[in-house]
Amino acid sequence: MKVLIPFYSMYGHIYRMAEAVAEGVREVSGAEAVLRRVPETLPTDVLQKMGAVEPQKAFAHIPVCTVDELAAADAIIFGTPTRFGNMCGQMRQFLDATGGLWVKGGLVGKAGGVFTSSATQHGGQESTILTFHTFLLHQGMVLVGLPYAFAGQMRIDEITGGSPYGASTIAGGQGERLPSENELAGARYQGKYIAEIAAKLKG
């Protein structure tokens, strides 16, 4: 059973969360986690001005995702940073190329979920995941979030990402904050949970 994890990461926060999601997937017997980057749309000179070139070298070895890989997966867990309360443009452009899959019903019945990051605690994490869910529903996918069975969502002793809609992390205004252990635990839980649901759907 293949669980695809397509993500976009500018400074590495979503990449780290994607790794944690993959760790959770691999806890399920017979589940294979496949990490993929979605294509970059920004020119190199713009990325340099944004200070993203060096951070992106850490995951440059991850292959770029293709639309065909979505159809071949048994479950898909998408990772995107928040951009003004929505998914990033790179992810949007990638998803806009899936019209052929929609026509064929290529994603119907597959388990799907989303994880995200934002600069601030209330920077649009939930709206990003919820608006992303619209795509999954149009494709006929089965939505899977991060249930409250993950007790880390109930913590009030620290600032942390995570909601019933999916795992998330807070990066800080300058990207200075790395995902906390609680946030990574949420990502692992979501990865494992979606893989378990996918296994049941696959029969």
UniProtKB/Swiss-Prot annotation:
Reactions accelerated catalytically: a quinone + NADH + H(+) = a quinol + NAD(+); a quinone + NADPH + H(+) = a quinol + NADP(+)
Cofactor binding: number and manner: Binds 1 FMN per monomer.
Cofactor(s) demanded: FMN
Highest taxon listed in the record's lineage: Bacteria
EC number(s) recorded for this UniProt protein: 1.6.5.2
Binding site for substrate: W102
Domain Flavodoxin-like, residue spans: 3-194
Gene Ontology CC annotation, any one: membrane
InterPro entries: Flavodoxin/NO_synth, Flavoprotein-like_sf, Flavoprotein_WrbA-like, FMN_Rdtase-like_dom, NQO
Residues noted as binding NAD(+) in the record, renumbered to the chain: Y11
Residues given in the record as FMN binding sites: 9-14, 82-84, 117-123, 138
Alphabetical UniProt keywords: Flavoprotein, FMN, NAD, NADP, Nucleotide-binding, Oxidoreductase
Pfam families: FMN_red (PF03358)
Alphabetized GO MF terms: flavin adenine dinucleotide binding; FMN binding; NAD binding; NADH:ubiquinone reductase (non-electrogenic) activity; NADP binding; NADPH dehydrogenase (quinone) activity
Xref: HAMAP family: NQOR (MF_01017)
Family to which this protein belongs: Belongs to the WrbA family.
Name of this protein: NAD(P)H dehydrogenase (quinone)
Organism: Geobacter metallireducens (strain ATCC 53774 / DSM 7210 / GS-15)
